[in-house]
Regions:
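Intrinsically disordered, low-complexity polar regions and short flexible loop motifs
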Residues: 133
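A non-catalytic, amphipathic alpha-helix used as a structural packing/dimerization or gating element
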Residues: 143-157
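Short glycine- and hydrophobic/aromatic-rich loop-to-beta-strand nucleating segment
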Residues: 33-35
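C-terminal cap/loop subdomain of S1 sulfatases and analogous C-terminal strand-loop tails that border
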Residues: 3-26, 40-42, 48, 53-130, ...
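Active-site-proximal N-terminal segment of extracellular/periplasmic enzymes that hydrolyze or transfer
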Residues: 4, 138-146
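A general alpha-helix detector
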Residues: 58, 136-139
Length: 170
């Protein structure tokens, strides 16, 4: 999940991707993933975003089990991806770490870094088109204000859910 330290002062490279370890830019969080179940999941590859919180819903779906209790599960089942029925993820992936926030959708990523101790307030957000600019070099927020508005609402809902989970409320 990205090379350690500041660029130039520590070994490692994120290649063409922007960011390093502990960044919520692609160079800090984009990693390959592998799921294998011989005889059950056909070999293949995808560029669809996924996250470790997708594992539990996927495993439960694969073994036809239901989660216990009434707590909501983070993540989605990737089972439809394995059989070719999933063309888009549909549900965005939220991240918050070290005064950064990010929301990754099927095409766009909303990202921001808060200054000082403003971790509870949303920072100024940038929008990156991960399909056409996986290196996150160009902020396209001005060109897509409706996407910024929609993803900002999604990010706020996601953060509220995370805060409820942190308190043990769900």
């Amino acid at each position: 999940n990205g090379p350690e330290g500041k660029a130039g002062s520590a070994p490692g490279s994120a290649g063409h991707l922007n960011g390093r370890k502990r960044d919520l830019l692609e160079g800090g969080i984009r990693v390959p993933g592998l799921i294998e179940w011989p005889g059950k999941i056909r070999p293949g590859n995808t560029t669809m975003p996924a996250v470790t919180s997708d594992y539990l819903p996927t495993i439960l779906d694969l073994i036809c089990a239901k989660p216990g209790g009434d707590r909501p599960l983070d993540g989605i089942s990737l089972r439809p991806l394995f059989n070719g029925a999933m063309k888009n993820r549909g549900q965005s992936i939220g991240f918050q770490s070290a005064r950064q926030v990010a929301l990754i959708g099927d095409r766009f990523k909303l990202w921001g870094r808060a200054g000082g101790k403003q971790v509870d307030k949303l920072p100024t957000l940038k929008l990156f088109d991960l399909v056409n600019d996986p290196s996150e070099k160009t902020d396209v927020a001005v060109q897509h204000p409706e996407v910024v508005a929609r993803m900002t609402r999604e990010l706020k809902i996601w953060r509220t859910s995370v805060q409820a989970s942190d308190r043990g409320d769900d």
